[in-house]
Amino acid sequence: MSENLRFRVVEEAFKKKAVEVAAPKERPSEYFAKYVFTRQKMYKYLPADVYERLIDVIDHGTRLDRSIADAVAEGMKQWAMEMGVTHYTHWFQPLTEGTAEKHDAFVEHDGKGGMVEKFSGKLLVQQEPDASSFPNGGIRNTFEARGYSAWDPTSPVFIIDDTLCIPTIFIAYTGEALDYKAPLLRALHAVDKAATSVCQLFYPEVKKVTCNLGWEQEYFLVDEGLYSARPDLMLTGRTLMGHESAKNQQMDDHYFGTIPDRVQAFMKDLEIQALELGIPCKTRHNEVAPNQFELAPIYEECNLAVDHNMLLMSLMKKVARKHGFRVLLHEKPFDGINGSGKHNNWSLLADNGTLLHAPGKTPEENLRFVTFIVETLMAVYRHNGLLKASIMSATNAHRLGGNEAPPAIISSFLGKQLSELLDHIEKADKDELFNLKGKQGMELDIPQIPELIIDNTDRNRTSPFAFTGNRFEFRAIGSEANSASAMISLNAAVAEALNNFRQRVDRLCEKGEDKMSAIIDVLRDDIKTCKPIRFDGNGYSEEWVEEASRRGLDTESSCPVVFERYLDSQSIAMFESTKVMNRKELEARNEVKWETYVKKVQIEARVLGDLSMNHIIPVSTHYQSQLIRNVQSMKAIFEPVKADRLSARNLKLIEEIAERTERIEALVEDLTSARRIANRIDDIHSRAISYHDTVEPKMESIRHEIDSLEMIVEDGLWTLPKYRELLFIR
């Protein structure tokens, strides 16, 4: 056989050194947002009256007046050209889970045979991409392709290389959202209105409530050479075969361990570029699995945080290649070790500085705290199936439910103290005051260690939606997902719950009941109603699946079936009542989700079939031929009895290889047949279910046979980099 690519790339990987990264001379605080059109730059480059009106649009949601657009565009162009920019693009988030952009140059004919740089308000505010070329669920056909991208002033413009990037929404000519940003902005507006209304029961001066989001991005890094020798990684983002390494994460020595030099250089480079783009990176560390890492920023306003996460994922891929790596954002790139998630820390902040999910110092403040906790639980309880659908994907399904990630059942962990408080409110006399214990100190009896302040909420890593002191942590979101999907459903559901709460309180007050008494009455009803969503136990246990089913929670795990929750009557009613999405938009999104699911599984099945027939079987039969020659040589040299004894092991291996390759060939034929049958199903929903039920199980069977062969075939013949090489060469 020709030279084994695997050994060549392994040898090259060992020779690679950390790329030197020159840090800027300025402090991070000085180069932060260097390539962002910040308020300070707006103030410098815009006329005073235009600046004031634009800030009003950003801060108070007033409608953008087209009359100021030209002045804003001119100021942006002037700043951008001083930064060496030559092009601009509307940067948006179609339903592909990535970002999209088309670059146009500033230059135009000047009418005198030359060129001049121009950028008008019209070009800033609106463009017309071809909507039929993006996933749209049938909303746009090729013969009616017009769509609009429209500037989102609340997310600042930024520069990548020589291009001015303008964050935009993307909608159809008929007005339906074809992206993630448009419904996210609607959901944030809905939760702002609803939370402000409820807030005013406690703080009449509150005029606005902001949703904040802090995400934690997990990822794997793999040497680029090793990656290029694994067609499955290149084409699907995960390994479709590969026996577990003898050592993986069982020693618990990678989590928070020393960061390898090459990885440290990558992280440093990434953070510098991220900070220059205004992404406030805060934390970096090794994660649990080998070659798995995490990056987390300081929390930001939700819409901006989502934009920054999408920008960061794109930046990670670019910087990784510079350092000889490929970044893997797939939720489960390797079997047998932890996958990657993206925890979303979600909170609400009133404009008077009050964190609405944080305990207060007075009974009234604690009543506000309990109100927002309970109504968030009501939202999660009513729409637990929808929230699961919002985080489900063909890729994340491989991670959820394993003993490494939250289960595919949405529940909420509150901690002992808060659970006891809600039980107390439910049963006690409502005239009793709400007194939460403050943070308590913990003496460790070690002189050199200061007293620790212990939070009065514990941690439950198995909970998908956990309260962590002043916010909720939504842990089920996948590492490569657009967080907007989960944030749209969560914020819309919370808005509905808060609206419902305020309406019931108002009705009681209209009947003459005291306001605080009315609040407590409604809360007590809701505490009873949403009790099934509260679970502080082990989410990994089989008992919990049975218990969750008894509680009426959604225990479905089939990805295509879970997507149906978007079209449940209560989901449609919730989205329409909050004006986040209408039925047509929801139906279109589900079409896209089912189609994306089918395509991802289809690609994996094709790649697995190709590798099985063109890599695994030839390599295995080549080794089998060597064994056959060895047996024949034994029989030529030794007397029959001795030859039989000495060649018995090889004969067994020859037989096992023959049987396993025969099974692989038959399974690949079955896999191809299952795909063909599924592909003939016209209804995309039914086709997705067919892929889940008939195609995916056959892929698992093929993998089992291949992984067994990997442990038999001579290492020198195996052409695909093994797990030990992918995970431990850094």
Residue ranges and their predicted role:
Residues K16-E20, P24-S120, Q126-N141:
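Histidine/acidic residue-rich metal-binding segments in metalloenzymes
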Residues S2-K25, T142-F158, T163:
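N-terminal hydrophobic targeting/anchoring segments and the immediately downstream early-domain regions
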Residues E144-L329, N338-G341, L348-E591:
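Glycine-rich, acidic/polar active-site loops that bind/position phosphate-bearing ligands
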